[in-house]
Curated annotation (Swiss-Prot):
GO annotation, cellular component aspect: cytoplasm
InterPro entries xref list: ATPase_NBD, FGGY_N
Induction trigger: Up-regulated by IL-4 and IL-13. Down-regulated by LPS.
Protein name: Sedoheptulokinase
Reactions catalysed: sedoheptulose + ATP = D-sedoheptulose 7-phosphate + ADP + H(+)
Effect of Q126K: Decreases sedoheptulose kinase activity
Length: 476
């Protein structure tokens, strides 16, 4: 009996790197079984030399180190069976490298690994160097999506103005997931799906092309823009044996983490997917043939992103999710340190969730937008309806969790989901899976059945895309 196909899925997230091995299982409702998975903290944050405190950058070497640790932890005999590799990662961000010099393949024990060489830091989606006045000075995009700070093309424009010498050092650019695919396959030029291209800005999803005329007129270095390919198609094949994965293994075009996450758990077209990790996304599938209005509206809280097969997802993407809870925990730890007390962040997190679980309701209202929002960058967080009876840790934590969900509701009213034909909400994401209070607030807010999926994340989605692609190729 021929062995069933196995695919490897990788997700290069903001705070962690995940890897998952999936095997086809036609007899199961899901169609697959998870053989193994692994996650490692990236711990890649680093200072920005040119952007100062507004910058949000990550050390690519540390991200790849976390990836290597993930692969090293997976069963070697299963890695030998891998027939396809799917890669997803954090959208909007950008790193630069020298073509042909982006990495070096080295012996790492029994197999080869690659290590970054002539690469820049990754400027992430959280980067804040492009303020409102700078964004207003940029040319108008020929796209249904507007441009925000942290978007790849906006970052290039900023570097062009503030650090032009920096750009002269590199001749290739992409998201972190595009970089990994390019290194695995030894691509002479990076390839990018429309999912990631749209997240950079200045990309027209209908024509599947960059706004080259607009960008050229503005002096933009268009040679840095990757070539475009269909999500779900093949980028190339591995140029080396990699952690027991055979040389010549198919590698898919890199996907956006949003699309891969949605793909992993949208069982029906009538499902909406709520993902609460570092940030928050609420996504629903648009009808086939839907085309967004071609005029970008920076004030619109709902964006329409490319999905698969030229369809779109309607997405409310909030910058404020698990990172808000992390900020609150860090604040409490810092306050206690100022008072001469030491306590672990993990202890504070678990205690505050316990306290909120016992506090079933509160009048305290927290608008949790400590990072602003893309459509309202200057509207920061606030606390209202403060009374002396609502100041316990339980009250504040309950109000914070409720505020995260209500902020999303203000961006995409749940009545709109009904009009799109949504019948169920599937909840996923690390912040949701480990926070019972946040789950309660989600169930309270949505007028639909809510189910919380197990093992729902972008690494599984990336593997699943490759697995189903592999199976469809076998069909007559």
């Amino acid at each position: 009996m021929a062995s069933r196909p196995v695919t490897l899925g990788i997700d290069l997230g903001t705070t962690s790197v995940k890897a998952a091995l999936l095997e086809a299982a036609p007899s199961l409702p899901s169609g697959f079984v998870v053989l193994a998975s692994c996650a490692r903290a990236a711990r890649a944050e680093t200072e920005s030399a040119v952007a100062g405190p507004q910058g949000r950058e990550q050390d690519v070497t540390r991200i790849i180190q976390a990836l290597n640790e993930c692969l090293d932890a997976l069963p070697r005999q299963q890695l030998q069976r891998v027939r396809g590799i799917g890669v997803s990662g954090q959208m909007h961000g950008i790193l630069f490298w020298k073509a042909g010099q982006g990495c070096e393949w080295m012996e790492g024990g029994p197999a080869f690994v690659f290590e970054p060489r002539a690469v820049s830091h990754l400027v992430t989606w959280q980067d804040g160097r492009c303020n409102s006045s700078f964004l207003a000075s940029l040319p108008k995009p020929d796209s249904h999506l507007s441009v925000a700070t942290g978007f790849g093309c906006a970052t290039i424009f900023w570097l062009l103005k503030n650090s032009p010498e920096f750009l002269k050092s590199y001749d290739a650019a992409g998201t972190i997931q595009d970089y990994v695919v390019a290194m695995l396959c030894g691509l002479p030029r990076p390839l990018m799906s429309d999912q990631n291209a749209a997240s950079w800005g200045y990309f027209n999803t209908q024509s599947q092309s960059w706004n080259l005329d607009t960008l050229e007129k503005a002096g933009f270095p268009i040679h840095l823009l990757p070539d475009i390919a269909e999500p779900g198609s093949m980028a190339g094949r591995t140029s080396h044996t990699w952690f027991e994965i055979p040389k010549g293994t198919q590698v898919g075009i890199a996907l956006g983490d949003l699309q891969a996450s949605v793909y992993s758990c949208m069982g029906q077209r009538t499902d909406a997917v709520l993902n609460i990790s570092t940030s928050v996304q609420l996504a629903a599938s648009m009808p086939v043939g839907f085309q967004p209005l071609q005029t970008p509206d920076p004030a619109a809280p709902v964006a329409f992103f490319p999905y698969f097969d030229r369809t779109y997802l309607g997405v409310a993407a909030s910058l404020n999710g698990g990172n808000v809870l992390a900020t609150f925990v860090h604040m409490l730890v810092q306050w206690m340190a100022d008072l001469g007390l030491e306590v672990e962040e993990s202890t504070v997190y678990s205690r505050m969730i316990q306290a909120a679980a016992q506090q079933k309701d509160t009048h305290l209202t927290i608008t949790p937008t400590v990072l602003g929002e893309r459509h309202l960058p200057d509207q920061l967080a606030s606390v209202t309806r403060i009374s002396s009876s609502d100041l316990s840790l339980g009250h504040v934590t309950r109000a914070l969790c409720r505020g995260i969900v209500q902020n999303l509701h203000s961006m995409l009213p749940f009545q709109q989901l009904k009009e799109w034909g949504v019948a169920r909400v599937v909840g996923s994401g690390s912040a949701l899976s480990r926070n019972e209070v946040l789950k309660q607030e989600v169930q309270r807010a949505f007028p639909f059945p809510v189910c919380f999926g197990q093992d729902v994340d972008a690494a599984f989605g990336a593997a699943l895309v490759m697995l189903q692609r592999d199976l469809s190729q076998k069909e007559p």
